[in-house]
């Protein structure tokens, strides 16, 4: 896929250049081509120290993407879920999650994605949610509209939690006090759905979901999501309502409407300072 002018805002210091966006799209194309033939095949699986699984596809894909970044922008930093950080204090840092939703990938569920993010001085500025098995792709750049499969994506209006469709990966990702806070929002929501991995954030950007609330999120989990959500007209913060950046985590909330975001934050924060 080639970058078009509508994807790139006018040149402003601190915003990604057309060359950076083109590389991000090339990385997403590479991820799709690499992962698709390996999906629902027999792959080696190991357990990381934190108990989560990692496959040979995760590690091999991240290595491929890192090599392409280093070849094109040798002064940029790279932070990845599997390979850690290199030049992590650089002004421009790429943030990679080669397979977000590894368990779904292992189980043959197509909701996993490759997340490609780019930060400038700790602020997420570019993000791609690439779903190789589904053929879905959201592209967000600071200062520019979000695109889904080449067409503009837009959140929907939703003023109140009582009118909202709420999504989260699952209850096991919350600590006990976090789950109690989440349950207050869940009890008030019109619809609540478990599962979906990062696909839920893309669906929020396209106006199908109103709220996504998660915990146990690291930089590689949320960096690419922020520009996608914001470029579609939504808002994504931590549970205190603060902007997300390189030092944020682990609790995140995304909303398509600032009004429902404010209501959900109030419910999450009852009797608790996050």
Task: Give the positions of each predicted feature.
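An extended, acidic
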Residues: 154-274
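A structural micro-motif at secondary-structure boundaries
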Residues: 148-149, 155
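N-terminal subdomain of lithium-sensitive/metallo-dependent phosphomonoesterases centered on the IMPase/IPPase/PAP
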Residues: 1-99, 266, 274
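Generic detector of well-ordered alpha-helical packing
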Residues: 59, 63, 82, 98-101, ...
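Short loop/edge segments at beta-strand edges and connector loops
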Residues: 80-82, 150, 195
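DPxDG-like acidic metal-binding loop motif
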Residues: 88-144, 163-164
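Short strand-turn-strand beta-turns centered on an Asx-Gly dipeptide
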Residues: 121, 149-150
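Residue-level signal for inorganic ion chemistry
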Residues: 35, 58, 69, 102, ...
